[in-house]
Regions:
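Rossmann-like NAD(P) dinucleotide-binding subdomain of oxidoreductase/dehydrogenase enzymes
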Residues: 2-123, 175
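ALDH superfamily catalytic-core signature
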Residues: 73, 79, 87-192
């Protein structure tokens, strides 16, 4: 099977996909995101050190359009597991269709926080802080907040205060802050 992982939770997604495939007895080809390939290289070194037989776990690096599309269309690959964007998920599904391979997609959701009039007084603050987990770079981050009209003005004030109190610093520094986003493209998406 082909395992195609995202940049925003690289080691988490690599571990989840590889462990599931290994337990099922599958051989696998892992293609990590080109934005965060070093986690997968480290994981490959750990697999080798653990004594996995040659050919059971395989790592290829490259971009989605080039390498990912080749994996999803390859006739010797029976399944593709992909976590990432809806756009890429559609392309993988179309590419995989010609070989009738199974496709597993996790395309995120960006669910909403619902804040009703009787909600806990910390609901808005908690919701904003959940968005900031992983520097806000999560497919499941609740980036929308739907607030009952009677709490709206208060919620806007609380959300702004909470967001303005979040500090950005080096990812390697200790303390309570968020790190930088992965690249300029993602930073621009946040600004837009």
């Amino acid at each position: 099977c082909a395992l195609i992982t995202p940049w925003n939770w690289p080691m988490n997604q690599v571990t989840l996909k590889v462990c599931a495939a290994a337990v099922a007895g599958c051989t696998m080809v892992l293609k990590p995101s080109e934005e965060s390939p070093l986690n997968a290289v480290l994981f490959a070194e750990m697999m080798h050190a653990a004594g996995f037989p040659p050919g059971v776990f395989n790592l290829v690096n490259g971009d989605g359009a080039g390498v990912g599309s080749q994996l999803s269309a390859h006739p010797d690959i029976d399944m593709v597991s992909f976590t990432g964007s809806t756009r890429a998920g559609k392309l993988i599904s179309k590419s995989a269709a010609d070989t009738l391979k199974r496709v597993h997609l996790e395309l995120g959701g960006k669910g909403a926080n619902l804040v009703f009039a009787d909600a806990d007084e910390k609901a808005v603050k908690r919701g904003v802080l959940r968005v900031m987990n992983n520097t806000g770079q999560s497919c499941n981050a609740p980036t929308r907040m739907l607030v009952e009209a009677s709490r709206y003005d208060e919620a806007v004030e609380q959300a702004a205060e909470t967001a303005n109190n979040v500090t950005v610093g080096p990812g390697s520094a200790e303390g309570r802050h968020i790190g930088p986003v992965v690249n300029a493209t993602q930073w621009q998406k946040i600004q837009d």
